[in-house]
Structures are given as C-alpha cells and as structure tokens.
C-alpha cells in the first residue's frame, strides 16, 4: 500500500492553502502529480490513489470548510508526522504548549483548536530544537512574532516563515536526500562546513530582503532562517 509523506515545503504549501481558503484537495493533488509522473505515464491516477488510501489526517484537512480550520494537538502531531524524516510525539507537543513555549503559542484560537499559524509554529519548534535550547527559541519567537494574540505585529507569519526556510532547504537539497548540495564553483571559496553556512546565510539574507523590515529585524529573521535550515 502506498504511503504519502511530503517534504516540509510541500507541508507549507498545504498550510498556506488552508490559511488562504484555497482547496486543500487541489493543493494535495498538485503535490501528488508532481511526485508521480512515472506512475501517471503508466496509467495510475490521483483518483485511484484517493480511492485506495489516504492518511486520515489528510482526509480531515480536505474536509475542512470555512471557519472550521482548527486543529487539535493530536491532529497537529499526525500532520507533522506526514513530513518526511519527522517523528513528533504527542507528549513533546503537550510539553511545548503547556510549558516550553506556553506564552508564545498562546491558547487555542479556534474554539478548543489551534490555528494553522499555531500549527506551523509547532513545526518550527520541532526544527529549531535540534540546534537551540528553549530559552533561545523563546527569545527568537518574542522578537519575530511579538504579541502571540496579535498577528498584525509579526515580522512574518509562522506559516510564511516555515515556507521560507523549507524552500531554501529544498533548493539546496536537489536530490532529496536530506543533505544540502553545494555547487563546485562555490566549493572553492572555503572549506565545506564554512561554505555551507555562507550559502545558507546568503540565501536567507536574499529572502528577508524582500520584506519591509528594519536592518535589525532582517538580521534576526535571517539568523532564524539560517538556524532552521
């Protein structure tokens, strides 16, 4: 039976579709078609895939309508575990919400459920915690997202941030092996480790340059993206 795991960038696309009231089914179909050109040439169709198996969490978000875009913590965990090479535990997420980033994620925004941006924030924590302690994560979140109950003061929304750094990672991981690839021309500049940091930081700087932010804000946001990548 075929499984349907997706990359971080693809997950960001689904979250953006949910947030912007686009059809999640259409967004998911686009991702599936992009990944299965060979099977399509052999006559296998998206409709056939849908009729055989789709993870329950994907069925759930496909069925969301209008203001019903909230996710329980268990649903966020299930969704996060559809990202390639990711294993999020429900216990960890409970600890983040109740203790580690309690003041930054705030309370559920849609009834008893969490918003798409809150879900993205938890996915960002999952990526950052391999490099940073929670004290550092909280400091970055305070600077980038400011008041957790007011989206208007965010330097960038959590979903957009998740999409930004996952896009950079995929650009540098063209063969999808979770190892960033560096061009030979750049390889000559310095040793591999330093050069990798240089390339990631350069791409992060280019990404934040498009946002209307102060120099300090751009610097912090670029550093956060570099760490997440």
Regions found by a protein language model. Name each.
Residues 4-5, 49, 58, 123, ...:
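Phenylalanine-focused residue identity feature
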Residues 1-47, 203-206, 212-229:
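N-terminal intrinsically disordered, low-complexity, charged/polar
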Residues 15-135:
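Basic helix-turn-helix/winged-helix DNA-binding cores
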Residues 136-229:
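Intrinsically disordered, low-complexity, charge-dense segments enriched in Lys/Arg
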Residues 8, 12, 68, 158-162:
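Intrinsically disordered, low-complexity regions
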Residues 1, 11, 18, 28, ...:
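Detector for methionine-enriched segments
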């Amino acid at each position: 039976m075929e499984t349907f795991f997706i990359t971080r960038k693809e997950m960001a696309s689904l979250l953006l579709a949910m947030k912007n009231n686009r059809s999640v089914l259409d967004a998911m179909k686009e991702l599936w078609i992009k990944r299965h050109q060979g099977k399509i040439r052999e006559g296998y169709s998206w409709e056939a895939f849908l009729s055989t198996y789709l993870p329950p969490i994907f069925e759930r978000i496909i069925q969301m309508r209008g203001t019903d875009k909230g996710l329980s913590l268990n649903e966020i965990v299930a969704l996060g575990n559809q990202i390639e090479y990711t294993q999020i535990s429900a216990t960890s997420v409970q600890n983040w919400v109740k203790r580690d980033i309690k003041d930054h994620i705030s309370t559920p925004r849609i009834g008893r459920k969490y918003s798409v941006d809150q879900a993205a924030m938890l996915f960002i924590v999952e990526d950052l915690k391999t490099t940073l302690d929670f004290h550092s994560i909280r400091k970055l979140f305070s600077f980038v997202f400011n008041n957790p109950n007011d989206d208007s003061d965010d330097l960038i929304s959590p979903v957009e941030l998740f999409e930004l750094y996952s896009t950079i990672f995929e650009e540098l991981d063209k063969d999808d092996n979770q190892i960033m690839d560096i061009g030979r021309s750049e390889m000559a500049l310095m040793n591999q480790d330093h050069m990798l940091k240089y390339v990631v930081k350069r791409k992060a700087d280019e990404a934040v340059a498009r946002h209307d932010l102060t120099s300090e804000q751009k610097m912090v946001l670029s550093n956060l993206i570099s760490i997440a990548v």
